Regions:
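Catalytic-site signature of metal-activated, phosphate-bearing donor transferases
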Residues: 1-6, 28-203
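Active-site nucleotide-sugar/metal-binding loop of Leloir-type enzymes
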Residues: 2-17
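Short beta-strand-to-loop acidic/aromatic patch adjacent to the donor-nucleotide binding site
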Residues: 15-26
């Protein structure tokens, strides 16, 4: 994966913002514009960390922090001020590195926007990581989460919330809680059409 993520950098010959946006991560246009404005206003900033709304079902998301999928020491670093010559030293964690007189340094270790700063600006993205059965089936195969689909179905059939995620998904070993989107005040950016089963952007 290192070769894959480094390949596009060869085409970047000027200072710019570099974003990692996975296929299951949704942002709004206004969020991207706002983050750009913040980087322009503070030229010394090097990167940005974010919180996310982490979906574990069509209508369920994680409600706690400093837990599974919400560990601020490594999640979620998604934006960097890229300068020509930088390279990826690691894909996971995403370490973009800069050459210097004393060797290579990790860009995000100095002057990054914190989770609190980006959240205060409304920059919390929506991560549809386990929103559909198809996603869970893939992760069951890819990560070896035996029985993941059955566990996920039981989680999403539960009638009461909040719930302890580890009581349903066996690979979650901490006290992570999940709750309904409406109880969390989350307005989803994508919804499944109950008639067709197709997912559509809501905005």
């Amino acid at each position: 994966k290192i070769e894959m993520v480094n390949a596009p950098l060869q085409a970047l010959n000027e200072v710019c913002l570099l974003w990692q946006i996975d296929v299951d991560e949704l942002w709004t246009r206004d969020q991207l514009i706002r983050m750009r404005e913040m980087f322009l206003a503070e030229p010394e900033r090097t990167a940005a960390f974010y919180w996310c709304h982490f979906f574990v079902g069509e209508d369920l998301a994680i409600s706690t922090r400093h837990c599974y999928a919400q560990r601020p020491e490594k999640e979620w670093l998604r934006t960097w001020r890229y300068r020509p010559g930088m390279i990826w030293f690691s894909h996971a964690p995403p370490w973009l590195s800069l050459p210097g007189p004393k060797g290579w340094s990790i860009v995000s270790e100095a002057h990054a926007f914190s989770h609190a700063e980006t959240e205060a600006a409304g920059l919390v993205f929506q991560h549809y990581a386990y929103a559909t059965e198809e996603q869970v089936a893939f992760k069951e195969r890819y990560y070896g989460y035996h029985g993941a689909v059955a566990e996920w179905e039981r989680l999403n059939q539960a009638r009461h919330a909040p719930l302890r995620l580890g009581d349903y998904l066996h690979w979650v070993q901490d006290e992570t809680r999940v709750d309904r989107l409406d109880r969390l005040g989350i307005v989803p950016l994508a919804r499944r059409d109950p008639a067709t089963g197709e997912w559509r952007f809501a905005h």
